[in-house]
Amino acid sequence: MTILVLGGRGKTASRLSLLLDNAGVPFLVGSSSTSYVGPYKMTHFDWLNEDTWTNVFLRASLDGIDPISAVYLVGGHAPELVDPGIRFINVARAQGVNRFVLLSASNIAKGTHSMGILHAHLDSLEDVQYVVLRPTWFMENLLEDPHVSWIKKEDKIYSATGDGKIPFISADDIARVAFSVLTEWKSQRAQEYFVLGPELLSYDQVADILTTVLGRKITHVSLAEADLARLLRDDVGLPPDFAAMLASMETDVKHGTEVRNSHDVKKVTGSLPCSFLDFAEQEKARWMRH
């Protein structure tokens, strides 16, 4: 069995690749980059270029590894990637793939939009087995701009989430769940897991934890949705539509959409997910002022 890992250098795919490599599990990484040279067997994969899809399976044959039988399916959430995602699943089936692990999101139900449509498509195929992973917001988002710059330069976190709470999850834990699912496949045809952290935290609480870990006061600045969208657009430089979408998602959190509990990480992997305090201790150098 060879596993195709899409998402190349993404947060979860890169971590999954490391776990598979350490375990000696045959896998091939599909990446949109044509120049990146990584430590694993890689092949070019472009959602908008169908020639690269069939080349993935040819590459496995040329490399002398077992045929691809399972795919870690990571796609963008843009509407224009839904149809290519469906077509790729069908191409993969024609190449003998019968197992898929789809990375979706906690707030995307089957059949709704983006990855939810791919979820529904997989569910309609009686000859395949699939697992859908539905993680909540990544802890690692705070290690990227604009959050990391706000924390380092201003000692602030800006959001429109108000007092809304999120069960923040580490990408390491998402990768552990994906690894366990792919390497210890159960007999069920269809399954979905909510991949959530061990605690519900507001950004006020996140700021308090960072204050303790970093030894300086970090403040959560609660903004109205329109004000956050304006900040992301004018100060951060995000496209207006994207800034508005992110601000809207945060308002959803304010209204309680991410208040969820799940023990799926422990059920699948046998161990609890990382707490935000432990994550902050591990990553605190990233927020330190130099």
Swiss-Prot record:
Lineage: Eukaryota, Fungi, Dikarya, Ascomycota, Pezizomycotina
Catalysis: reaction(s): festuclavine + NAD(+) = 6,8-dimethyl-6,7-didehydroergoline + NADH + H(+)
SUPFAM superfamilies, alphabetized: NAD(P)-binding Rossmann-fold domains
Encoding gene per record: easG
General function of this protein: Festuclavine dehydrogenase; part of the gene cluster that mediates the biosynthesis of fumiclavanine C, a fungal ergot alkaloid. DmaW catalyzes the first step of ergot alkaloid biosynthesis by condensing dimethylallyl diphosphate (DMAP) and tryptophan to form 4-dimethylallyl-L-tryptophan. The second step is catalyzed by the methyltransferase easF that methylates 4-dimethylallyl-L-tryptophan in the presence of S-adenosyl-L-methionine, resulting in the formation of 4-dimethylallyl-L-abrine.
Pathway stated in the Swiss-Prot or TrEMBL entry: Alkaloid biosynthesis; ergot alkaloid biosynthesis
Cross-referenced CDD domains: TMR_SDR_a
EC number assigned by the record: 1.5.1.44
Gene Ontology BP terms: alkaloid biosynthetic process; ergot alkaloid biosynthetic process; fumigaclavine C biosynthetic process
GO MF annotation terms: oxidoreductase activity, acting on the CH-NH group of donors, NAD or NADP as acceptor
Listed InterPro entries: Ergot_Alk_Oxidoreductase (IPR051604), Ergot_alkaloid_biosynthesis (IPR019901), Ig-like_dom (IPR007110), NAD(P)-bd_dom_sf (IPR036291)
Induction text: The expression of the ergot alkaloid synthesis cluster which leads to the synthesis of fumigaclavines is positively regulated by the brlA and stuA transcription factors.
Top-level enzyme category: oxidoreductase
Biotechnology: applications noted: Ergot alkaloids are known for their toxic effects on humans who consume contaminated grains or livestock that graze on grasses harboring ergot alkaloid-producing fungi. Due to their strong affinity for monoamine neurotransmitter receptors they may also have clinical uses such as treatment of migraines, Parkinson's disease and cerebrovascular insufficiency.
Family: Belongs to the fgaFS/easG family.
Keyword Oxidoreductase on entry: yes
Superkingdom in the source lineage: Eukaryota
Species annotation: Aspergillus fumigatus (strain ATCC MYA-4609 / CBS 101355 / FGSC A1100 / Af293)
Protein name as it appears in the record: Festuclavine dehydrogenase easG
Swiss-Prot/TrEMBL keywords: Alkaloid metabolism, NAD, Oxidoreductase
